A protein has these predicted regions:
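Active-site-proximal helix/loop segments of hydrolytic enzymes
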Residues: 1-210
Length: 210
């Protein structure tokens, strides 16, 4: 089940975006955008995950905030509070959580990027790393997807096409499904169904949208 962070064009503060995902107990957070560049020939999709620098700075902020410390940190349905822990233990627990989330984010982003490559050109051939605020959740795998360049006339036309947007959505969903099939998290559909993969459909064909 998908939960929208926003359903209209209202602005939502960057940190509140991933915090809403945490409150919804999301298994994954995906931020979807259209890219822009001064070079109007730039084209293709990109997928980003949080850089090591971003993870380190976020960990420091998280531990310094008493409200955050009382929150629950965990991966795959196992959560603990940092509020009653020795400071050194808190650092270790948060580090373990972040490392696990980083690996999961990278794996999921790699699957999504491959699925987008099947649909069309990729601007970057590999998953990129950046210190984007929306990617800083300490315990939810997160990625940011640039679906194409709105400054490129051809891609702007495609992005304005409902059919192309359906294909993009389907390609992204197939990449996410592939990740959960490979690494089913406790409590998810794929864990309950015994890791059974759905029949594959070529993203470029449009397919039948679930």
């Amino acid at each position: 089940r998908a939960v929208l962070i926003r359903s209209d064009d209202q602005f939502v503060a960057l940190q509140d975006r991933y915090m809403r995902a945490r409150r919804a107990k999301a298994d994954m957070f995906i931020s979807i955008h259209a890219d822009a560049a001064e070079n109007h020939a730039a084209s293709g999709s990109s997928v980003y995950v949080l850089s090591d620098k971003g993870a380190s700075s976020q960990a420091a902020r998280w531990l310094a905030d008493k409200e955050n410390a009382a929150d629950l940190i965990g991966v795959g349905g196992t959560s603990v509070s940092l509020d009653d822990k020795d400071p050194n233990l808190s650092v270790t627990l948060l580090d373990l959580s972040q490392n696990a989330i980083k690996r999961m984010s990278e794996d999921a982003a790699g699957n999504v990027l491959q699925s987008l490559k099947d649909l069309g050109k990729a601007h970057k051939k590999q998953v990129e790393y950046a210190n984007f605020v929306v990617l800083r959740s300490p315990d939810v795998p997160s990625m940011l997807i640039e679906t194409g360049f709105i400054t490129n006339a051809d891609e702007e036309r495609k992005l304005n096409s409902p059919e192309h947007r359906k294909r993009l959505a389907y390609a992204i969903s197939q990449g996410v499904r592939a990740f959960f099939i490979e690494q089913p998290l406790p409590g998810t559909y794929y864990a309950r169904s015994g890791n059974i993969a759905p029949a594959g459909v070529n993203a470029a064909s449009g397919g039948v949208f679930p």
